[in-house]
Amino acid sequence: MRNFQGKRIPVETIDKILNLALRAPSAGYTQGWAYVVVTDQKIRRKIGELQGESDFYAKRKHKFISEAPVLIVACISEQLYHDRYREPDKLKNDGQEIEWTIPFWYFDIGGACTIIFLATVNEGLAAAFTGIFRQQQMKELLGIPNHFLPIGIVSIGHPKKDVKSSSHRRGPRSSKDVIHYDRW
């Protein structure tokens, strides 16, 4: 969904959605995420500008960032994970922090954003996600602390008639191509 009505969304609804996201699983119960909820129209427009909305998204005729009544900027702190995994119950037998072969912080924020999507739909609303292209400028605009990284924007609003994007028209991959039991 990339086309929203401009109708206001009550703060209570956004709080309900985000409180569900706080229940997402996280490595070591670190919960290294934070969210900036943007409802101010001027700030939403600035975010749209940072994202290159007028160039890239204008081709689709929908400004789904600046025109969405609510933007949730999802942020993650790698530092909080390192801090948590230096605590006694998470150290390896040799007393050292684990080696992060997979950056769990990205997995965790992805799971939390999925819950935001599901909770949004459950409220009769629609959501769209986009990555952040100019992270440093976004941090400055929103006053995000240095140890947090803004990784994505969830645009939320009441759905408006939408035209399917070329990505959506591709359709999903076949379940037989992606689900494997016991062995690949």
Protein language model features and the residues they cover:
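C-terminal helix-cap and adjacent tail motif
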Residues: 1, 76, 90, 152-184
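Generic N-terminal amphipathic, Lys/Arg-enriched alpha-helix
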Residues: 1-7
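Short amphipathic alpha-helical segments
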Residues: 14-22
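Glycine/small-residue-rich phosphate/adenosyl-binding loop
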Residues: 30-109
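N-terminal structural module
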Residues: 21, 27-30
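A glycine-rich helix N-cap at a beta->alpha junction
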Residues: 58, 62-71, 143-165
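Small-aliphatic-rich amphipathic alpha-helix that forms the alpha element of a beta-alpha
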Residues: 21-22, 72, 92-141
